């Protein structure tokens, strides 16, 4: 027999972000705990609104299946002595409710142990759910939980009611919260405004429909879809197109139970404000959706003097709600207009002295000092990249002004507009387009998935800003630990790598870090002998993560290009970021087309055996390290001659970074190496004669070293 189960937790208005998180958590937690309780079920439906969390489980058996379990007891030598049961055996059998003759001895990896096969009768589902429900509530996680009344129960907002039904029967659940006891029933509440009365849920399976009649759309996806469609329709009514941010849409979805679209209007005089100011006021501060005139790209769109909001109130009072919304946004936009006019009253450069009042970090001084460091680092990068004199001037100017907007009134009020306003104020002050654009772009990327700077000036200053933060904070010994990363150092390092790769900048990061660290120590009298090693390891770890997660390179191929605690590969990786990326992608491609498989066996085998030798890994040429007089077979001579032919191809690949040429050469040598190992004229590498052994290991070492120009084949796993 199967039943439908309903649990609803009724609350005061929950934070929107918690509603979404709770859905995700329950979608994982509830099926997992049911499976652990032998009540596996594929029909777990989680619902949530600002005032309730609910789950409906269909086709739930009324009891667990009966089952057998093998239960491990004490070691056999402790349970039996001279063939007779000891107190340990008696205690185990008593605890399990079985007879002594039911005990069995089985051999495990850790020795012989006593076991018992126990038949366990399935419990009623109602009893199991009674145990699980408090755990489902207790295990929910969020940022801010609270206590209420005089109890110890914690939840983001006070719990006001519980519904728990198995089909049409109430499942008794009690949540104790000091003197307050919350007891399950079949009564829920409808919409606060549209249906504030109690509603009775007669059957668990009817939950969604009963709530809908009380003006509650409990299904997050349905609610979100309705809101999105209402916004689009409303925008079309005013001959516009709404910009629907996925983040804002998700938030608004969890702020309402029965969404109603409301169209508002603002004075056209505010359209002279930069569009980013108006949309920031709407989206970030008021949770309104802006409306645009065209369907072009966002940057080209022209704002209309309208906005769209989603109300949780009475649809018949939409006009009154719109008036209230219009009053609020008028005040906010008037503030923005005042800030904008005030900020434009003086040129952007005149704000630089005020940066002395903004602290970057207590020991590192003000943002003005950070700007000086950014200018210095930007010059180093421009020098490395051999940038033209004209572009270098733009870079230096933009670096000087890149943080000036932080002390403007607009950015003080709307911090998310940093860089955006700097670009506009720079343009208004007569700075070149390259300088203005670079001021905005140096903040890019602002997070995972964000756009990257497109201009060389923006790229250089963005790199300089991030490298300054990394070296300075690491220089103070403030390394990120676990989830604690207050200066967003991981994001900064990711930005350095992604910008370099996106723009194909041939950066020598190893040299840059040395130069920046030297200047840092001179300026701040800090001593940290491990700084470069710590920074190198940190950046290499970020490179590894990006290759794995964003470039989808196999883990063993990532290890092959970065090495495993290999000093040569570490330094090489930071000296040429583009080469690391290109080698990883190339390896992935030749794995997929089968070419890697054709050279893998011989090179991997050679690499593993060569580890027993002492040949320097940078040695490529056989002339100085191979004694042909020690050859005992034709296969050795053939191997030697093949290596002589291989070296020029390796050197060309090393110089041009054309690794296909090296792989072609390795393909050519592979049969010769196979014959050396397993052919009719094969040899024993580990010869009793130490000189012959060394000579043969050197042959293998040379092949390994030539292949190392591409990757460490010892790290590659057979596909």
Curated annotation (Swiss-Prot):
Repeat among keywords: no
GO molecular function terms attached to this record: arginine-tRNA ligase activity; ATP binding; glycine-tRNA ligase activity
Cystine connections: none
Localization: Cytoplasm
EC number: 6.1.1.14
Regions crossing the membrane: none
Annotated segments matching region Disordered: 65-84
PANTHER family according to UniProt: GLYCINE--TRNA LIGASE, CHLOROPLASTIC_MITOCHONDRIAL 2, GLYCYL-TRNA SYNTHETASE
Subunit composition and interactions: Tetramer of two alpha and two beta subunits.
Family, similarity comment: Belongs to the class-II aminoacyl-tRNA synthetase family.
Protein name per UniProt: Glycine--tRNA ligase beta subunit
UniProt source species: Trichodesmium erythraeum (strain IMS101)
């Amino acid at each position: 027999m199967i039943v439908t189960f309903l649990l609803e937790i009724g609350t005061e208005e929950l934070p929107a972000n918690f509603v979404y998180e709770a859905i995700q958590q329950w979608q994982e937690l509830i099926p997992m705990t049911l499976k652990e309780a032998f009540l596996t079920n594929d029909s777990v439906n989680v619902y949530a609104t600002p005032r309730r969390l609910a789950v409906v489980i269909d086709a739930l058996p009324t009891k667990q299946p009966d089952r057998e379990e093998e239960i491990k007891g004490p070691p056999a030598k402790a349970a039996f002595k001279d063939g007779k049961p000891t107190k340990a055996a008696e205690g185990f059998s008593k605890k399990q409710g079985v007879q002594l003759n039911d005990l069995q001895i089985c051999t495990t990896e850790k020795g012989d142990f006593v076991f018992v096969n126990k038949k366990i009768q399935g419990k009623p589902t109602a009893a199991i759910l009674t145990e699980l429900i408090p755990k489902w509530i207790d295990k929910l996680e969020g940022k801010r939980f609270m206590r209420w009344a005089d109890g110890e129960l914690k939840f983001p907002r006070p719990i006001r009611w519980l519904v728990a039904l198995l089909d049409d029967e109430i499942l008794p659940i009690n949540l104790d919260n000091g003197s307050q006891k919350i007891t399950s029933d079949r009564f829920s509440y409808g919409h606060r405004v549209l249906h504030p009365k109690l509603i009775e849920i007669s059957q668990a399976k009817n939950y969604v429909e009963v709530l809908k009649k009380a003006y509650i759309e409990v299904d997050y996806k349905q609610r979100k879809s309705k809101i999105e469609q209402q916004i689009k329709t409303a925008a079309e009514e005013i001959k516009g197109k709404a910009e629907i941010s996925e983040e804002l849409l998700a938030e608004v979805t969890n702020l309402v139970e029965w969404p109603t679209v409301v169209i508002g209007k603002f004075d056209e005089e505010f359209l002279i404000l930069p569009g980013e100011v108006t949309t920031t006021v709407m989206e970030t501060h008021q949770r309104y959706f802006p409306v645009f005139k065209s369907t072009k790209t966002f940057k080209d769109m022209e704002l209309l003097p309208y906005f769209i909001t989603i109300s949780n109130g009475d649809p018949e009072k939409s006009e009154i709600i719109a008036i209230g919304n219009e009053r609020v946004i008028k005040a906010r936009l008037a503030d923005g207009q005042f800030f904008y006019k005030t900020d434009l009253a003086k040129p952007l450069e005149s704000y630089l002295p005020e940066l002395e009042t903004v602290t970057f970090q207590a020991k590192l001084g003000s943002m003005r000092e950070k700007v000086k460091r950014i200018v210095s680092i930007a010059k180093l990068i421009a020098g490395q990249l051999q940038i033209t004199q004209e572009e270098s001037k733009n870079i230096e100017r933009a670096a000087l002004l890149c943080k000036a907007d932080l002390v403007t009134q607009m950015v003080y009020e709307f911090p998310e507009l940093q860089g955006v306003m700097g670009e506009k104020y720079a343009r208004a002050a007569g700075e070149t387009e390259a300088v203005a654009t670079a001021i905005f772009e140096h903040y890019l990327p602002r997070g995972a998935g964000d756009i990257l700077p497109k201009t060389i000036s923006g790229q250089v200053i963005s790199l300089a800003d991030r490298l300054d933060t990394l070296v300075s904070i690491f220089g103070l010994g403030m390394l990120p630990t676990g989830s604690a990363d207050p200066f967003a150092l991981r994001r900064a390092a990711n930005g350095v790598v992604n910008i370099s790769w996106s723009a194909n900048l041939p950066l020598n990061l190893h040299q840059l870090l040395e130069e920046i660290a030297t200047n840092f120590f001179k300026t701040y009298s800090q001593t940290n002998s491990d700084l470069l090693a710590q920074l190198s390891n940190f950046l290499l770890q970020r490179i590894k993560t990006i290759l794995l997660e964003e470039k989808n390179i196999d883990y063993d191929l990532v290890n092959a290009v970065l090495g495993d605690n290999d000093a040569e590969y570490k330094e090489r990786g930071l000296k040429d970021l583009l080469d690391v990326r290109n080698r990883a992608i190339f390896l992935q491609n030749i794995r997929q087309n089968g070419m890697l498989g054709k050279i893998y066996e011989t090179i991997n085998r050679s690499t593993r055996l060569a580890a027993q030798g002492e040949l320097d890994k940078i040695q490529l040429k056989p002339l100085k390290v191979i004694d042909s007089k020690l050859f005992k077979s034709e296969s050795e001579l053939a191997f030697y001659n093949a290596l002589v032919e291989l070296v020029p191809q390796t050197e060309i690949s090393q110089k041009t970074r054309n690794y296909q040429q090296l792989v072609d050469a390795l393909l050519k040598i592979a049969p010769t190496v196979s014959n050396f190992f397993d052919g009719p004229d094969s040899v024993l590498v580990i010869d009793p004669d130490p000189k012959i052994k060394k000579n043969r290991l050197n042959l293998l070492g040379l092949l390994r070293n030539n292949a190392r120009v591409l990757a460490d084949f010892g790290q590659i796993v057979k596909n």
